Amino acid sequence: MSSIEKPCSASCERNREPILAVLTEYFPGDRRVLEIGSGTGHHAVHFAAAMPQWQWQCSDRAENLAGIHSWLEEAALPNAPEPIELDVASGNWPDDRYDAVFSANTLHIMGWEEVQALFLGLPNVLEHDARVVIYGPFNDDGRFSSDSNAQFDQLLRGRASQMGIRDQAAVDALAQRAGLQLIASVPMPANNRCLIWQRIR
């Protein structure tokens, strides 16, 4: 795949710097990072280039791997290996363990059963003191944080009934069952947030 065919994401271009600021705070030092749902691969290249001490492992469903590969091939970063196939619903988690997990704009695309499968599988790939950062829009006790998020949720559910903005408390309940403790909820531009968990067991 040539560089002309690289998949692009305008939202990644807009949010990559605010997200990087959060990651550099909560992923200090050398980290082996697993990105779940790497999408285009845009974030991976930007973050791996900015933080060479991180080993950034992309993952996604099989149909997205070629696009991710095109970004990684062009960037040729020594700390960003080939993407691996990961479909959380199928349970094909990698055998490796990671110090950190990152995922952006995935929970509202996944069905709720897939979100549950994600957190059920996380302990299998997390080191004992790992951190997890998930970026995206979230509700609070069923309430939308903005009119634009309510409109976005309606758009998502129009595309597929299983999609939709998730409630932070419901997601955190899954995280707690996976042995994770919420240590921060960082407001982000465009009515998004970064939720940060620490593995405690």
Residue spans of the language-model regions?
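Conserved beta-strand signature within the Rossmann-like core of class I S-adenosyl-L-methionine
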Residues: 129-141
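Short alpha-helix
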Residues: 162-179
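Class I SAM-dependent methyltransferase SAM/SAH-binding core
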Residues: 34, 42-91
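Core SAM-dependent methyltransferase catalytic element
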Residues: 180-201
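Class I SAM-dependent methyltransferase Rossmann-like catalytic core
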Residues: 1-29
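A short, conserved alpha-helix within the catalytic core of class I
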Residues: 110-122
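Conserved glycine-rich SAM-binding loop
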Residues: 39
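A short acidic, Gly/Pro-enriched loop at the edge of an enzyme's catalytic core
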Residues: 93-101
